[in-house]
Amino acid sequence: MRSRLTAIILIGMILGILVGYACHILWPDPATAKTIADYISLFTDVFLRLIKMIIAPLVFSTLVVGVAHMGDTKSVGRIGAKAMIWFVGASLVSLLLGMVLVNLLRPGDNLNLPLPDAQASTNLKVTSLSMKEFVAHLVPRSIVEAMATNEILQIVVFSLFFGVACASMGERARKLVEGIEELSHVILSITGYIMKLAPIAVFASMAAIITTQGLGILVTYGKFVLEFYFGLVLLWCLLIAVGFLIFGHHSFRLVNLIREPFLLAFSTASSEAAYPKTMEQLEKFPISKKIISFVLPMGYSFNLDGSMMYCTFATLFIAQAYNIVLPLGQQITMLLLLMLTSKGMAGVPRASLVVIAATLASFNIPEAGLLLIIGIDQFLDMGRSATNVIGNTLATAVVAKWEGEKVHLPEPALRPRVA
C-alpha cells in the first residue's frame, strides 16, 4: 500500500508538470496564467491547511504521552540535550557545506542576467530575533494562541510542562494520559484520511508552479539550480553516510521507510506536509513514541538542514553576483550569524528568504539581490523541504540509538511495535 501511494504521488507530480506546461503555452499572458494557477493551487492550499489543522493536537498529544511515559525530568533533559547536540552539529555542517560549495563553484560569477538596482525593494519584511527575544518567544503567552498560529516550539514547551506534571502525579493522572493517548490515535487516523489527498495536492502544486513560471526559468537559472541541488545531494550522502556509521546497512532501510514523506515534502515544498507521515514511518524502524514525539517537533525548529545550506549558498551567490568579495573571516562570521538568526524563524512564511534578507543587510550586500532568486525560490524550496525530512528523520533515529533503543533489529515485520 505504501509503495502504491508513492507511485501515485509520482504520477501526480509528472501529470502536474505536463498540465502546467500546457497551461503555460496556452495562456502565455502572466496575469491570466497567475489567475489559472491560483485556481489550480486551491487544492494544494486546502491540503496544507488540513495538515496544519492536525499538527498542533498531534504534537501536543504525542509529546505529552511520551514525556509522561518517561517518568522523570532527568530523562527529558537528557534526551533534549542529546537532540540539541545533534541539531547544532548538523546545522553547522550544512552551513559550512553551503559556504564551501559556493566558493568552489562560484555560481554568481559571469551571471548572464541583468542585476536588480541595489535600491530596489523586495517587499520582504526583514526581521530577526535577538537572543533575548528568541528566549522570550519560546514561552507561549497562551497555549490557545500558540496552537492557533501553529507555533511548534511554544507547543513543545507547554507540552513538556504538561507531560512532566502528569508524570509527577503518577496514578492520579493515569486516566488523563490514557485519554490523551487515545486522542493521538484519533489524530493519526485523521492523518490517514488526509494523506489520501496527497496525490491531488502534488498534482496541483506542480501544475500551478509550471503554469506561472514555465520550464524556461530553470534554463535561465540552470547553473545556480543545478549547483544548489548538487550541494543538496552531497548533504544527503553525508547524512546517510553518518547514518551508515551508526546503524550500518539498516540506515538504507530507514531511508527507504521515509521515501513517501520525502516525496511529499519535495512535491509540495512543505516540510510540515510530511510531518505526520514521518512520525508514522519512524515507528516502523522502530523508534519509541516518546523519542519521536519529543525530538521530531524540536527538529522542525532547530534542525532545518536544507534551509541552513541554502542560506549560506544564496547569500554568497548574491555577493558574487554584485562582485562583492567577503574575506574568509567575514564568511565565518556570517555562518555563525545565520546559525543564530535562523533559529527564531520557525513558522515564518518564506523563512529562508527573510533570514537571507536580514543577513544581506548585516554585511552591506544589496538586499535587492534577493530578486535574483525569488522567482525560482519555489523550485529550491522543494529540495530544502525534502532535505529537512531526511535530517530530522536521522536526528530522531540517532537520539533513539544514543538512548539505548534497539532501532536496527532485523525482521521488522516480526517485531512488536515499540510503545
What are these regions (language model features)?
Residues A68-S75, N110, M169-R174, E182, ...:
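Juxtamembrane helix-boundary/capping and inter-helix hinge elements in multi-pass membrane proteins
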Residues G89-P114, E227-E260, L264, S271-A274, ...:
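Transmembrane alpha-helices that form the ion-translocation and gating core
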Residues V46, L63-V64, A83-V88, F161-V164, ...:
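Transmembrane helix-bundle signature of multi-pass membrane transporters/permeases
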Residues L257-C311, L338-L353, I376-F379, G383-V398:
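Alpha-helical membrane segments and immediately flanking helix-loop junctions
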Residues T32-Y39, G77, G179, L215-K223, ...:
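Membrane-water interface of transmembrane alpha-helices in multipass transporters/channels
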Residues R2, T6-L10, I17-A22, D29, ...:
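Signature of multi-pass transmembrane helix bundles
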Residues T312-A419:
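Transmembrane alpha-helical segments and their short flanking loops
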Residues K74-K82, S189-K196, K284-Y300, L328-G329, ...:
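Membrane-interface alpha-helices at helix entry/exit sites of multi-pass transporters
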